[in-house]
Amino acid sequence: MPRSRINGNFIDKTFSVVANILLQIIPTTSGEKEAFTYYRDGMSAQSEGNYAEALQNYYEAMRLEVDPYDRSYILYNIGLIHTSNGEHTKALEYYFRALERNPFLPQAFNNMAVICHYRGEQAIRQGDSEIAESWFDQAAEYWKQAIALTPGNYIEAQNWLKITRRFE
């Protein structure tokens, strides 16, 4: 049974109903419909913390989806799961792949910055200030890109950039 039929969450149910209606009225191929079904089921599983199931659905959606823009969101969500699992190298890889297909994903730049900042803090705890500065500089570059795409967002990042004199 498709995940959308067994999910008890009202918002997920509403999304599923609207998505099903759109799939019926918007002219799409059967492959596009199937890809979206896997994507939707992946989002549902991810929202419940069922990451293994979500990844299976996202990988199937990637196999079927041909549109680069749509693929960017699938890749982004895979990155989110790897971030949640503490697999930062894999997460960065998927965020990069998402941005290759859609360079207007400020949330991907933000998440990459957060990972780099975290790695900078780890380097400080290990006593390696040179490596830490390198990670912080990389975080700053990603945050600048996120802020450039959505100037009113990422206020904490903007403050950090100003405090650390990395904001131009």
Swiss-Prot record:
Pfam families named in the record: TPR_1 (PF00515)
The UniProt record lists the keyword Transcription regulation: no
Xref: SMART domains: TPR (SM00028)
TPR repeat locations: 35-68, 72-105, 120-153
Entry's Gene Ontology BP terms: photosynthesis
Keyword Plastid: yes
Topology relative to the membrane: Peripheral membrane protein
GO annotation, cellular component aspect: chloroplast thylakoid membrane
Domain of life: Eukaryota
Compartments it resides in: Plastid, Chloroplast thylakoid membrane
InterPro entries per the UniProt record, alphabetical: PSI_Ycf3_assembly (IPR022818), TPR-like_helical_dom_sf (IPR011990), TPR_rpt (IPR019734), Ycf3/AcsC/BcsC/TPR_MFPF (IPR051685)
Alphabetically ordered keywords of this record: Chloroplast, Membrane, Photosynthesis, Plastid, Repeat, Thylakoid, TPR repeat
NCBIfam families per UniProt: PRK02603.1 (NF002725)
Cited function: Essential for the assembly of the photosystem I (PSI) complex. May act as a chaperone-like factor to guide the assembly of the PSI subunits.
HAMAP family the record matches: Ycf3
Matching PANTHER family: CELLULOSE SYNTHASE OPERON PROTEIN C (PTHR44943), TPR REPEAT-CONTAINING PROTEIN MJ0263 (PTHR44943:SF8)
Family according to the record: Belongs to the Ycf3 family.
Protein name: Photosystem I assembly protein Ycf3
